[in-house]
Amino acid sequence: MRDSKKYVVKIPNFYLVKTVTGVEEWAVATHFEPVQARYALPCFDEPAIRAKFNFKVTVPNELTSLCCMEVTDKSVDGANTTYSYATTPSMSTYLLAVCCGKYDFVEGSTKSGIKVRIYANRGEGMGFNFCEPPTLGSRD
């Protein structure tokens, strides 16, 4: 896709997340398999047909945007932050992943230097100590 049109995503993937403290907050996440990618972008929803994708996501400053690729640029313009992501490898549309919400993260590296981040809903990072050691060790 080589245009810069803005698409309004009209797919049923807006979730009301209840935090551990009982607060309800909205989070947005894609769930394109098996054939829902066509509701978000013009494409052939066929696993054998692949393409490379570039994502740029703008969210209010209090939210974090995550994508299936690494952030290449992050810019703040007033009340909004725009995240730009690296180009994906050639892939099927159902593998695309983007989510936005209030998240915290911890970051570490494997012994071989691969950067790993673990995300949780903001304020719910108590599980980080449980999942970080096995996650970082799983790639070495």
Where are these regions (language model features)?
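Acidic/His-enriched low-complexity segments
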Residues: M1-D140
